[in-house]
Curated annotation (Swiss-Prot):
This is Mesencephalic astrocyte-derived neurotrophic factor homolog. Disulfide bonds join 28-114, 31-103, 61-72, 148-151. The gene is Manf. SUPFAM superfamilies: SAP domain. Its main location: secreted. It comes from Drosophila sechellia. InterPro entries: ARMET-like, ARMET_C, ARMET_N, EF_Hand_1_Ca_BS, SAP_dom_sf. Belongs to the ARMET family. Residues 1-22 form the signal peptide.
């Protein structure tokens, strides 16, 4: 009887340990969010065929920027990708595996996939632009796909951001 209780307790603890080791979204945020967004964009007929998923993913990758573009590079979704582990994404997606589990498998193949992190967004309504570095001001403009031709000094970048702020910054009412 004691042996049976011990087996049950060990089984319970093993299950508990397994669930606590499962990958969380914040551990691999770029992967999880990109896989979810991609999976949501697929129609039902495409979701069943992993070859079609790979083709659609390559098209999807052509439109990605920044961290998502790097994620595509690591998976082999870009023409210039050095390696290709695309089937580690496409096959589990065709089985309707959740994004967290897919990213867990991808992390085992290539750990740098989960090293990708989104940069913290700057709240333009509360930040003092004069206190930011020029690098951060350039990043704001770059994120907006805007340029600042002829900007040499910090004041020039701040002026350009202030001009564009109404277009890109929507304050909650």
């Amino acid at each position: 009887m004691k042996t049976w209780h011990m087996v049950v307790v060990i089984g319970f603890l093993a299950t508990l340990a397994q669930t606590s080791l499962a990958l969380k979204e914040e551990d691999c945020e770029v992967c999880v969010k990109t896989v979810r967004r991609f999976a949501d964009s697929l129609d039902d007929s495409t979701k069943k065929d992993y070859k079609q998923i790979e083709t659609v993913f390559k098209k999807f990758c052509k439109t990605q920027k920044n961290k998502e573009h790097r994620f595509c590079y690591y998976l082999g979704g870009l023409e210039e990708s050095a390696t290709g582990i695309l089937n580690e994404l496409s096959k589990p997606l065709s089985w309707s595996m959740p994004a967290e589990k897919i990213c867990e498998k991808l992390k085992k193949k290539d750990a740098q996939i989960c090293d990708l992190r989104y940069e913290k967004q700057i709240d333009l309504n509360s930040v003092d632009l004069k206190k930011l570095k020029v690098r951060d001001l350039k990043k704001i403009l770059n994120d907006w796909d805007e340029s600042c031709d002829g900007c040499l000094e910090k004041g020039d970048f701040i002026k350009r951001i202030e001009e564009l702020k109404p277009k890109y910054s929507r304050s909650e009412l």
